[in-house]
């Protein structure tokens, strides 16, 4: 509940309030270089979120960080995206017992996420990807790819 309370406190502050950076530091355990994180923002633990340099997190993002969520340098995350590490059993008997596991998410450098993207447990997204609005990324994606759809697939390779 500590992280949830800190996220609530962050989300009550004005964008211009100098206390924001201190609250973000308390959520993550550090303050990344050149981070822009807009409210509202929600995380489960905070300590499992590893953000690179020059990361932009737009409004209304959720980081379900039961496992590590590692975001590379120069990553731009559009509004209302979710990074979900928790995975529940298909078998209802196990699910009803509260069993779940968390799988890490990794995002390479120089990626751009459109609005309302969902990244599911255990996914790795290579560097230089553009993920279209509304995509649901359920499997690993290669670097320099335009990714779209639900479930998401590679639309084309981005020539750099």
Model regions and ranges:
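Conserved G/P- and acidic residue-centered "switch" motifs that form tight phosphate/ATP-binding loops
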Residues: 131, 149
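Short hydrophobic beta-strand element within catalytic cores of glycosyltransferases
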Residues: 137-138
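Terminal amphipathic alpha-helical/low-complexity segments used for targeting or macromolecular assembly
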Residues: 1-34, 152-156
């Amino acid at each position: 509940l500590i992280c949830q309370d800190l996220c609530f406190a962050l989300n009550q502050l004005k964008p211009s309030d100098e206390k924001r950076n201190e609250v973000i530091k308390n959520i993550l355990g550090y303050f990344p270089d050149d981070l822009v994180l807009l409210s509202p923002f929600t995380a489960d633990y905070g300590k499992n979120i590893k953000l690179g340099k020059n990361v932009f997190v737009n409004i209304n993002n959720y980081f379900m960080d039961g496992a590590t969520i590692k975001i590379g340098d120069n990553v731009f995350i559009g509004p209302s995206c979710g990074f979900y590490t928790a995975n529940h059993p298909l078998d209802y008997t196990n699910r009803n017992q509260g069993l779940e596991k968390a799988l890490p998410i990794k995002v390479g450098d120089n990626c751009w996420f459109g609005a309302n993207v969902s990244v599911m447990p255990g996914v790795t997204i290579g560097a230089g990807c553009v993920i279209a609005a509304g995509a649901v990324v359920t499997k690993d994606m290669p670097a320099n790819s335009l990714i779209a759809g639900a479930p998401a697939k590679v639309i084309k390779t981005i020539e750099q």
